[in-house]
């Protein structure tokens, strides 16, 4: 999959099937839209995701978004920051200049509540009207719902901020996870029967509340259940950055330097300060 961040002009793409939105988290609603443009590849179209205006703190990192979309079959991810030009572009001009002119769109998939263009005056009805005139088809999908609430990035963020890993999993179709190279910690966990891995999440990634979670950690060809502390490691003085420290059950390996992906399953309790590392060891080993 090709990833392009739009700084000035859009690339010229021929025969594209496009879906538009923020796409900072690929939740169930986004997935339905992506599936629609993937279907158009059978007609010779390139499947293009146009992500409009990503937040400074995102549910998924750029790497995670790219991997998920590539696995789904997307050909091109265009990330378009909300520059002055884009913010003040009339919806009609957005359709003519970008969708028709630059992307040579043959198919567009959007949700029924999608809005775009200056003052958010662009609507699915407008896309359909222009499609009839300029020869592209617009498919409008209903909102994906959880009960009476629309599934949206805002909904996902709220549940993540609550530490509700089960609801996050339902909305996204996958676990919340943190991944990266295992860092060297202070080397004290092993002394107190706490073999651990340490990860530093990217600064742009939204994190759940500080606390202790049930997790599963994945390394190349093996996985370990464990518990993970998200926070400032208060027992050992407290770092100024958020750390993800995981105790792995039934693991005696030296995993420093390995690539690790930690899937969060359930919130256990808030982060708390212990009187000693011995107390930490005892508490962790006796958790249900």
Tell where the protein language model's regions lie, with residue ranges.
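Phosphate/ribose-recognition catalytic cores of enzymes acting on nucleotide-derived substrates
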Residues: 185-285
């Amino acid at each position: 999959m090709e990833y392009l961040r739009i700084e000035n002009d859009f690339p010229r793409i021929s025969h594209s099937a496009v879906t538009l939105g923020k796409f900072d988290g690929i939740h169930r609603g986004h997935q339905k839209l992506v599936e629609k443009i993937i279907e158009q590849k059978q007609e010779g179209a390139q499947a293009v995701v146009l992500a409009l205006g990503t937040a400074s703190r995102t549910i998924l990192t750029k790497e995670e978004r790219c991997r998920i979309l590539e696995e789904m079959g997307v050909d091109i991810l265009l990330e378009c920051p909300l520059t002055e030009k884009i913010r003040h572009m009339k919806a009609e001009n957005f359709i003519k200049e970008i969708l028709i002119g630059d992307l040579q769109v043959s198919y567009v998939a959007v949700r029924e509540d999608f809005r775009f263009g200056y003052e958010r005056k662009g609507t699915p009805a407008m896309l359909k009207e222009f499609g009839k005139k300029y020869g592209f088809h617009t498919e409008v999908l209903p909102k994906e719902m959880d009960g009476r609430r629309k599934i949206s990035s805002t909904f996902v963020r709220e549940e993540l901020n609550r530490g509700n890993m089960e609801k996050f999993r339902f909305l996204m179709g996958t676990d919340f996870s943190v991944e990266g190279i295992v860092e060297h910690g202070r080397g004290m966990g092993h002394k107190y029967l706490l073999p651990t891995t340490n990860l530093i999440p990217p600064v742009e990634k939204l994190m759940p509340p500080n606390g202790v979670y049930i997790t599963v950690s994945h390394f190349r060809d093996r996985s370990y259940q464990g518990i993970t502390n998200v926070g400032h490691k208060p027992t050992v003085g407290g770092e100024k950055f958020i750390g993800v420290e995981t105790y792995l059950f039934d693991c005696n390996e030296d995993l420093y330097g390995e690539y690790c992906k930690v899937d969060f399953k359930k919130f256990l309790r808030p982060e708390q300060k212990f009187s000693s590392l011995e107390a930490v060891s005892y508490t962790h080993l006796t958790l249900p």
